[in-house]
Amino acid sequence: MSKNTVSSARFRKVDVDEYDENKFVDEEDGGDGQAGPDEGEVDSCLRQGNMTAALQAALKNPPINTKSQAVKDRAGSIVLKVLISFKANDIEKAVQSLDKNGVDLLMKYIYKGFESPSDNSSAVLLQWHEKALAAGGVGSIVRVLTARKTV
């Protein structure tokens, strides 16, 4: 009887928390190398009047995996600058040019802009939110609000 108990004691060496799907693991995927969007490329697209390309360039390299708040703030200000420079008539066409992940990323930046409103940014961000919601649906909002990695 005791021999059977000793051999079955191996189960105590198993770390059951390792198999918990709700356990948070802070993964570092080499995010320190992410510098965010290229500000020079975005500015050149804005100067040329190519707003859709400026939006694509601003969303191209998001600093999602980095822990540096300065990099995230810089990327947020670049995207906000692009969003503010759009005309109201062109917003829907620009949102339609994005794929599902692009719309989700845009929503992340919109909510980041809502966190720290400036003089006219809230009205512009609400227009962008309306068009992004029409393109991505409610699921886009849910994915942004439940995401662990932020921009």
UniProtKB/Swiss-Prot annotation:
PTM statement from Swiss-Prot or TrEMBL: Polyubiquitinated by RNF128 with 'Lys-63'-linked chains, leading to proteasomal degradation.
N-acetylserine carried by residues: S2
Molecular functions per Gene Ontology: actin filament binding; structural constituent of cytoskeleton
Highest taxon of source: Eukaryota
Main location, first listed in the record: cytoplasm
Native species: Mus musculus
Record protein name field: Actin-related protein 2/3 complex subunit 5
Gene3D superfamilies: Actin-related protein 2/3 complex subunit 5
Assembly information from the UniProt record: Component of the Arp2/3 complex composed of ACTR2/ARP2, ACTR3/ARP3, ARPC1B/p41-ARC, ARPC2/p34-ARC, ARPC3/p21-ARC, ARPC4/p20-ARC and ARPC5/p16-ARC.
Role according to the record: Component of the Arp2/3 complex, a multiprotein complex that mediates actin polymerization upon stimulation by nucleation-promoting factor (NPF). The Arp2/3 complex mediates the formation of branched actin networks in the cytoplasm, providing the force for cell motility. In addition to its role in the cytoplasmic cytoskeleton, the Arp2/3 complex also promotes actin polymerization in the nucleus, thereby regulating gene transcription and repair of damaged DNA.
Subcellular location: Cytoplasm, Cytoskeleton; Cell projection; Nucleus
GO cellular component: Arp2/3 protein complex; cytoplasm; lamellipodium; nucleus; site of double-strand break
Any one of the GO BP annotations: cell migration
Chain intervals for the UniProt region annotation (Disordered): 21-44
Pfam families: P16-Arc
